[in-house]
From Swiss-Prot:
Function, in words: Phosphorylation of dTMP to form dTDP in both de novo and salvage pathways of dTTP synthesis.
NCBIfam families according to UniProt: DTMP_kinase (TIGR00041)
This protein's name: Thymidylate kinase
GO biological process terms, semicolon-separated: dTDP biosynthetic process; dTTP biosynthetic process; dUDP biosynthetic process
Keywords associated with the record: ATP-binding, Kinase, Nucleotide biosynthesis, Nucleotide-binding, Transferase
GO molecular function, a single term: ATP binding
Catalytic activity reported: dTMP + ATP = dTDP + ADP
Gene: tmk
CDD domains per UniProt: TMPK
UniProt-listed Enzyme Commission number(s): 2.7.4.9
Family the entry assigns: Belongs to the thymidylate kinase family.
Entry GO terms, CC: cytosol
PANTHER family, A to Z: THYMIDYLATE KINASE (PTHR10344), UMP-CMP KINASE 2, MITOCHONDRIAL (PTHR10344:SF4)
Length: 213
């Protein structure tokens, strides 16, 4: 099964991901956690270009295509091989990030970005996506705890950009209700984790029941 975690920076999705992995392994599932942009040697090199604070003048389409190129490398060399071995893959970000950040916030258009991704990635969709929905104030507070030094080029965007990203995510949730489930990420990490693992275990049980029939 292929699961993706999505949300604004500071939503707590990465912390929850690690706790989910630990619990699934305790239940004897084989799990691979990975991230985007990156997750593979060449994809990580592309990540450095995308997030480098020096690259402030990057064109919106250049940015989008770099994300998609990194994603395809990650998909072909890491995600697909793991799925073929019946390993549960959980990725910190995937296609919906590019739709929200570049399609919505960079004003390229969600539909256009989705079309390009479908062509390049051959319609590869996650089985389940969790959107970690957090308020701007809570996300900012968590980002401050992480420290300014941890901020990359996209973290440093203005609030107007982040608002567009958020609206992009809400639109994706609205248009993909079967795949994308919402997590209330304003709660403490244990409550956030409990929401996430409940949905994931239900999906796993559903898949296992379908396979056995």
């Amino acid at each position: 099964m292929f699961i993706t975690f999505e949300g604004m920076d500071g939503s707590g999705k990465t912390t929850a991901l690690l706790k989910v992995k630990e619990e699934l392994e305790r239940l004897n599932y084989k799990v691979l956690i990975t991230r985007e942009p990156g997750g593979e040697v060449i994809a990580e090199q592309i990540r450095q270009i995308i997030l480098d604070n020096k690259n402030k003048d990057m064109d919106a389409w250049t940015e989008a295509l770099l994300f998609i190129a990194s994603r395809n490398q990650h998909l072909q060399k890491v995600i697909k091989p793991a799925l073929e071995k019946n390993i549960i893959v959980i990725s910190d970000r995937f296609i919906d990030s590019t739709s929200a950040y570049q399609g919505s916030a960079r004003n390229i258009g969600v539909d256009v970005v989705s079309e390009v991704q479908q062509i390049v990635l051959k319609n590869c969709l996650p089985d389940l996506t969790l959107f970690f929905d957090v308020s701007f104030s809570e996300a900012e507070k968590r980002m401050q705890i992480r420290g300014e030094s941890s901020k990359n080029r996209l973290d440093k965007e203005e609030n107007n950009f982040k608002q567009k990203v958020y609206q992009g995510y809400l639109e994706l949730v609205k248009n993909n209700p079967k795949r994308i489930k919402v997590i209330d990420a304003n709660k403490d990490i244990d409550q956030v984790y409990n929401q996430a693992i409940k949905i994931i275990l239900e999906k796993l049980k559903e898949n296992e029941k379908r396979t056995s029939n």
